[in-house]
Regions:
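A compositional/structural signature for long, glycine/proline-rich flexible linkers
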Residues: 2-367
Length: 367
């Protein structure tokens, strides 16, 4: 995104901070979802849409693909493109004390449609994913489908967390084999028909949040707006639409990304009240980096007020915890599934990669 030249009022710091705060959830999740679907350098990438990736070993400190990776659960990721056809995913039964299915789209609202805490995963389950824009599907029931999940975005993630019981070798082996039984098919494929052709699409460049805010934020937000369902009665939805409208970003506006360089700016004639230039991009970056630092301080504080307010469904989130969860590390389980308390140092200083740190918990302190 970028101070205004042609608008007499311009963009002040307060306006820009509001734009960044309202946009953060979308840009963060755009980067996450597209990385897991499209980034060939992401070791956990599915290698495309409507495909799955199953981990084969528990995460450790070397894992960089996920912010705050759990080291006691394994992941099975499914990245969804719901534009041309619904996607049907088969989930097997697991021999595990904890399994949860988490879904989210570019808007970063989190749903847990299945979990062992709700009695799920005792038997196989087939789920159909779709959106209001999915072509050729009107919500009609499909034989063999157990559950239907309407997503808020055309591009989305659905992934499992599985406690594999690593201390029990046979149980671990069984769960690793079961993870490979998760399959994703378009509805046409599920019904034994050829897959429908899907319109090829060029995504605005994804990467680090600060880079996108500086060089491509407006293009990413326009893309996101075109592929997200907004609720006219939802305060946060309407606030982000209002914040971006002066920049010319509105749902349904077409633009051509054919000549966009990596994290650069294609030539687009924005119908904007405020014109942006390169200096604005740098300012957006500074604000985004400051918000990320503020959010990390909140997250790591023993007095973090948002432990029970993050990773919730639409309608149950407020802006402050949404910004914090998006800036610190997108995608997580709500408090009834997992907790994310911050861990600080004994001297109160920030952790430094030059040092080693030891975290000790007694057996009685473990959950």
């Amino acid at each position: 995104m970028s101070s205004s030249k042609n608008n007499p009022t311009g963009l002040n710091t307060e306006n820009m901070r509001n734009i960044v705060r309202r946009s953060y959830q979308y840009i963060a999740m755009y980067n996450v979802i597209n990385s897991f679907a499209l980034d060939e350098y992401n070791p956990m990438s599915t290698g495309g849409w409507n495909k799955t990736y199953a981990m084969t070993a528990l995460a450790d400190h070397t894992v960089r693909a996920i912010a705050r990776p759990n080291n006691d659960t394994l992941y099975v990721l499914t990245m969804l493109d719901l534009r041309g056809d619904p996607v049907v995913v088969h989930y097997p039964a697991f021999d595990s004390k904890f399994v949860s299915l988490e879904t989210s789209a570019y808007d970063h609202y989190v749903d847990i449609p299945l979990s062992t805490t709700k009695g799920d995963f005792k038997k196989p389950m087939t789920m159909l994913y779709y959106t209001d824009r999915t072509q050729g599907y009107d919500g009609a029931p499909v034989e063999g489908v157990d559950k239907y999940m309407k997503m808020s975005g055309d591009f989305a993630s659905a992934f499992l967390r599985i406690m594999p019981h690593a201390a029990e070798p046979e149980r671990l082996k069984k769960n690793l084999a079961t993870m490979k039984e998760v399959t994703a098919k378009t509805l046409s494929e599920y019904l034994g028909k050829p897959a429908k052709p899907v319109e090829k699409i060029r995504f605005p460049a994804f990467g680090r949040d600060a880079d996108v805010f500086e060089k491509g934020g407006r293009y990413v937000m326009q893309f996101v707006f075109n592929h997200t369902t907004f609720d006219p009665n939802d305060e946060m939805d309407q606030a982000v639409l209002a914040a971006l409208k002066p920049l010319g970003v509105e749902p349904g506006q077409y633009f051509n990304l054919a000549n966009q360089p990596a994290l650069g700016s294609p030539t687009i004639q924005w119908k904007a009240e405020i014109e942006l230039d390169e200096s604005d991009g740098k300012k957006f970056r500074e604000i985004a980096e400051k918000i990320a630092q503020e959010s990390l301080a909140i997250w790591n504080s023993p007095d973090n007020p948002y432990l029970f307010d993050v990773f919730k469904p639409k309608g149950k989130m407020t802006l402050e915890p949404m910004v914090v969860q998006s800036a610190v590390g997108p995608i997580g389980n709500p408090a009834d599934q997992a907790m994310y308390p911050g861990i600080g140092t004994t001297d109160g200083k920030s952790m430094n990669a030059l040092n080693d740190y030891v975290i000790r918990m007694s057996k009685d302190q473990l959950p």
